[in-house]
């Protein structure tokens, strides 16, 4: 907890092509070494691939994938009387979004397709349909929280 004032959240500019703030955030998550133009090319390429493969609106598929990958609960370590307990806690909305984006990116990087835009397109389509690496990660986190439900009275 900061001892001084609370730092205000920065206003995120929506992306130029679709006018979506979430897409702009995702661009920043995908970006490596400050190369935003490369991240932009990857994401727009992936969205084009999504429209080709599914025939649906790419932004809708992206938003569905994002909402499907968001975790509801996660576990945090809490030390009580010399023992560490994994305590399930609810994830706040901003962290939900950040985790979902990170998991989508990581799952896309682990896929086998040739280029990153194809990998990302495949992962977003899979996540929108409720499968894929990001969904596996979310389910794993939910399972951990479910298994440690007995320690939920140690809330922070």
Curated annotation (Swiss-Prot):
Keywords: Ribonucleoprotein, Ribosomal protein, RNA-binding, rRNA-binding, tRNA-binding
A single Gene Ontology CC term: small ribosomal subunit
Pfam families for the chain: Ribosomal_S7
Key word Nuclease present: no
Keyword presence, RNA-binding: yes
GO BP terms, alphabetized: translation
Highest rank taxon of the organism: Bacteria
Molecular function per GO: rRNA binding; structural constituent of ribosome; tRNA binding
Record's function text: One of the primary rRNA binding proteins, it binds directly to 16S rRNA where it nucleates assembly of the head domain of the 30S subunit. Is located at the subunit interface close to the decoding center, probably blocks exit of the E-site tRNA.
Subunit structure: Part of the 30S ribosomal subunit. Contacts proteins S9 and S11.
Family per record: Belongs to the universal ribosomal protein uS7 family.
The name this protein goes by in its record: Small ribosomal subunit protein uS7
Species, as recorded: Chromobacterium violaceum (strain ATCC 12472 / DSM 30191 / JCM 1249 / CCUG 213 / NBRC 12614 / NCIMB 9131 / NCTC 9757 / MK)
């Amino acid at each position: 907890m900061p001892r001084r004032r609370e730092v205000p959240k920065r206003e995120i500019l929506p992306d130029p092509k679709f006018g979506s703030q979430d897409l702009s955030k995702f661009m920043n998550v995908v970006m490596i070494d400050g190369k935003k133009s490369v991240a932009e090319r990857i994401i727009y390429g992936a969205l084009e691939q999504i429209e080709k493969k599914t025939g649906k609106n790419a932004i809708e598929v992206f938003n569905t994938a994002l909402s499907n990958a968001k975790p509801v609960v996660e576990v945090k370590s809490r030390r009580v009387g010399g023992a560490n307990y994994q305590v399930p806690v609810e994830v706040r909305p901003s962290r939900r979004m950040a985790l979902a984006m990170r998991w989508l990116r990581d799952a896309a990087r682990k896929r086998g397709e040739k280029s990153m835009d194809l990998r990302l397109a495949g992962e977003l389509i899979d996540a929108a349909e409720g499968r894929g690496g990001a969904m596996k990660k979310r389910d794993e986190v939910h399972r951990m929280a479910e298994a440690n439900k007995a320690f939920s009275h140690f809330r922070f």
